[in-house]
Amino acid sequence: MGAGIAGLSFAIRAAEHGRVVVLSKGKVMESNTAWAQGGIASVLPDGLRDPGDGCDKHVADTLGAGAGLCREPVVRMVVEEGAAAIDDLTRYGANFDREAAEGGFVLGREGGHSHRRILHSKDTTGREIARALVEKARQTPNLELLEDHFCIDLVTTGKLGAVSDDRVLGAYALERATGEDRVFRADRVILASGGCGKV
């Protein structure tokens, strides 16, 4: 559930292993990802990164800016996988700003960062990332994007009366165009729908 950067990135990879259905409560280009104007931070490979930058420095910057709210193992994993994620996005067609002469990425430095490591696509970075991911998802075999499907609840064994274990078996969604409730059965359900305050 969710057609932003997290949901589509996961769905594209998961579709290599089986059928994937992505539910979006609205149009796929209306995700929070598409509205993001800032850049995306990554320590790029040697030769492309700001001299002296590295993953340890990015981790330290993130932990410092996070004021004790970040989990270091999670931060380290995200930072260390950042360059591969940027590579995926560029292979999917995302166009980040580049130096005219050399063709390398234009790297910006923003608050909380000790080095230039922010990639932009003009002032619509999120929209460009979303565009590339949506296009890639639509071209991916085994992947179906369903817009205007609002998830109502998860289907669980507990709700079906099973007492021994409580597992997720799928989701109930409202198809807005028809007003009908639909049931989606699934071996795995991934919640990638933004803030989890009401989960």
Which residue ranges define each predicted feature?
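Glycine-rich His-Gly loop
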Residues: A3, K25, G194-G195
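Structural detector for helix-capping/boundary residues
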Residues: A3, H149, D187-R188
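N-terminal Rossmann-like FAD-binding beta1-loop-alpha1 element of flavoenzymes
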Residues: M1-V22
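Conserved N-terminal/central alpha/beta ligand/cofactor-binding core
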Residues: R19, S24-L169, A173-A177, K198
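Glycine-rich loop(s) and the adjacent beta-strand/alpha-helix scaffold that form part
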Residues: R188-V199
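Short glycine-rich, flexible loops that bind phosphorylated cofactors or substrates
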Residues: L8, E180, K198-V199
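Core beta-strand elements of the Rossmann-like FAD/NAD(P) dinucleotide-binding domain
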Residues: A177-R188
